[in-house]
């Protein structure tokens, strides 16, 4: 008794999950409103964007916003240009075009959730490929492979990425502590630097 050949699975040459219109709307809203920036950064990170240029724009906007600088098309284009990334991000005209995608800046958080969901789906696809590779390679104990596969899926479900993010308050506190530790030996009793 022979079994019928297996049906081919879904093609891996398909485009990964994405919503470019949502990405453009998020960025356009951020370029239009500080409130939109505050809403969006609660939902997504730069790595959540499908288009690399969008990640560059997002990171530049959030850098400007984090420094208390205005983040509009002019300042964002200038910052990207100083970094040598303006053309990779699409250029000045593309930044202006992003503003045309915005109907209501109040919807920015909703669009950001769409971007976040698509990013999770892309990570799930990537994780499934890694899990399939683990299974095909079959290196190590089966229980260890299963554990690694489960951890891979868990990381996707908790939105972990290769970059670990920490709240700014933690970073500032640890940086301040390090600076104090460096400065302490240089200070003479009485709090003044030695002559």
Task: Please place each PLM-identified region on the residue numbering.
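Noncatalytic partner-interaction/assembly domains of nucleic-acid and motor enzyme complexes
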Residues: 1-120
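Conserved catalytic-core motifs characterized by acidic clusters
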Residues: 6, 139, 165-168
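The Walker A/P-loop phosphate-binding site
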Residues: 31, 163-195
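Short, flexible helix-adjacent loops and helix caps
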Residues: 42, 69, 136, 161, ...
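Alpha-helix boundary/capping detector
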Residues: 52, 83-88, 137-141, 158, ...
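Generic structural concept
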Residues: 54, 58, 77, 125-128, ...
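Extended, charged alpha-helical coiled-coil/arm scaffolds that mediate oligomerization and mechanical coupling
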Residues: 92-162
């Amino acid at each position: 008794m022979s079994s019928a050949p297996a049906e081919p699975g879904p093609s891996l040459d398909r485009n990964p999950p994405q919503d470019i219109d949502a990405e453009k709307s998020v960025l356009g809203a951020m370029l239009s409103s500080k409130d939109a920036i505050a809403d969006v950064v609660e939902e997504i990170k730069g790595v959540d964007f499908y288009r690399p240029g969008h990640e560059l724009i997002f990171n530049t906007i959030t850098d400007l916003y984090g420094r208390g600088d205005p983040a509009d098309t002019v300042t964002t284009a200038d910052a990207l240009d100083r970094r040598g990334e303006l053309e990779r991000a699409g250029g000045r005209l593309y930044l202006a075009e992003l503003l045309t995608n915005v109907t209501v800046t109040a919807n920015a958080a909703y669009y950001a959730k769409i971007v976040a969901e698509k990013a999770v789906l892309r990570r799930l696809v990537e994780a499934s490929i890694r899990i399939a590779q683990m299974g095909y390679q079959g290196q190590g104990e089966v229980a260890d492979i299963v554990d690694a596969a489960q951890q891979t899926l868990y990381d996707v479900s908790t939105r972990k990425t290769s970059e670990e993010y920490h709240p700014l308050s933690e970073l500032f506190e640890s940086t301040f502590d390090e600076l104090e530790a460096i400065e302490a030996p240089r200070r003479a009793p009485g709090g003044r630097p030695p002559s």
